[in-house]
Curated annotation (Swiss-Prot):
Belongs to the immunoglobulin superfamily. MyBP family. Residues 148-238 form the Fibronectin type-III domain. Myosin-binding protein which plays a role in cardiac function. Seems to regulate conduction in the atria and ventricular conduction systems. It comes from Homo sapiens. This is Myosin-binding protein H-like. Its main location: cytoplasm. CDD domains: FN3 (cd00063). It is found in: Cytoplasm, Myofibril, Sarcomere. GO terms for biological process: in utero embryonic development. Pfam families: fn3, I-set. One of its GO terms (cellular component) is myofilament. The gene is MYBPHL.
Length: 354
């Protein structure tokens, strides 16, 4: 069997070997027809993979953490052969005492065990491979609770309301304020109640205060981390006093209830039997209270022990005790007051039993 030989290559042409191996780098034997001055075939170097960074979507916006939180960012990249990954913070080298970096074959990890506000800033990752380079920028913001407003002042108290003013805090917690929370407390209970939340101005009016109470006020600043740990309290109390009410009485005419006597229920005729007590009734209305006079056959019988006269709430009664045949006749009840008089009559018949 003849030995395998390399194919002949014309002068000035190229030979491309696919899937080359280190063994292929040995120079092939020249064919008998190949001249002494022909070029020797060489193995081409592998094509490099350009460096590229795959930045996670969550890191394309500002990455916000609270003071004391852990920052652990894994950034994948590509490049062949293995590229060189370099981190910077605001254009300067990282502080290795606080920030640690681990670079792998296809990713780089940025780790901060306990983030502080000084760790905020712009972090840049550069992946270099030969003369090629890819960069990615990550903005990290480390925030904490804001400081309290610098002061609070009770400006005015009127009616059921009080006006407050305060100044913004010096420290906003490394982020924008979301507003203020205003609370009130009366001196009787000492309990704090929120009256305003997420309030953006530095002055407000607190209404619906209760008469007779004294109030203190305090204001918290608020950001993404929450309310400030402390709040200033007004030194002056708001005393809600009851306004003196002056009543002006209007003159009015006193109603005159005076009237002359008038019988609303007259006497009724009756027939009785000898020896049985008999009562006569009538009703009268008058003001002032009238004087009641009883008559028999137009003769005054006041003071006669045979008769008993009573008057109560305008009801007049006359009791005839054990009437006899001579007690029959015309009985009259007369009512008299300064405005006039009135009278009613009835007939009483006394029968003797058989």
């Amino acid at each position: 069997m003849e030995a395998a030989t390399a194919p002949e290559v014309a002068a000035g042409s190229k030979l491309k070997v696919k899937e080359a191996s280190p063994a292929d780098a040995e120079p092939p034997q020249a064919s008998p027809g190949q001249g002494a001055g022909s070029p020797t075939p060489q193995l081409l170097p592998p094509i490099e993979e350009h460096p590229k960074i795959w930045l996670p979507r969550a890191l394309r916006q500002t990455y916000i953490r609270k003071v004391g939180d852990t920052v652990n960012l894994l950034i994948p990249f590509q490049g062949k052969p293995k590229p060189q990954a370099i981190w910077t913070h605001d254009g300067c080298a990282l502080d290795t005492r606080r920030v640690s970096v681990r670079n792998g074959e296809q990713d780089s990890i940025l780790f901060i065990r306990e983030a502080q506000r000084a760790d905020s800033g712009r972090y840049q990752l550069r992946v270099q491979l030969g003369g090629l380079e890819a960069t990615a920028t990550i903005d990290i913001l480390v925030i904490e609770r804001p400081g309290p407003p610098q002061s609070i002042k009770l400006v005015d108290v009127w009616g059921f309301s009080a006006t407050l003013e305060w100044t913004p805090p010096q420290d906003t917690g490394n982020t924008a304020l979301l507003g203020y929370t205003v609370q009130k407390a009366d001196t009787k209970s000492g309990l704090w109640f929120t009256v305003l939340e997420h309030y953006h101005r530095t002055s407000c009016i607190v209404s619906d205060l209760i008469i007779g109470n004294s109030y203190a006020f305090r204001v918290f600043a608020e950001n993404q981390c929450g309310l400030s740990e402390t709040a200033p309290i007004t030194t002056d109390l708001a005393h809600i006093q009851k306004a003196a009410t002056v009543y002006k009485t209007k003159g009015f005419a006193q109603r005159d209830f005076s009237e002359a006597p008038k019988f609303t229920q007259p006497l009724a005729d009756c027939t009785t039997v000898t020896g049985y007590n008999t009562q006569l009734f009538c009703c009268v209305r008058a003001s002032p209270r009238p004087k009641i006079i009883w008559l028999k056959n137009k003769m005054d019988i006041q003071g006669n022990p045979k008769y008993r006269a009573l008057t109560h709430l305008g009801i007049c009664s006359l009791e005839i005790r054990k009437p006899g045949p001579f007690d029959g006749g015309i009985y009259t009840c007369k009512a008299v007051n300064p405005l006039g008089e009135a009278s009613v009559d009835c007939r009483v018949d006394v029968k003797v039993p058989n």
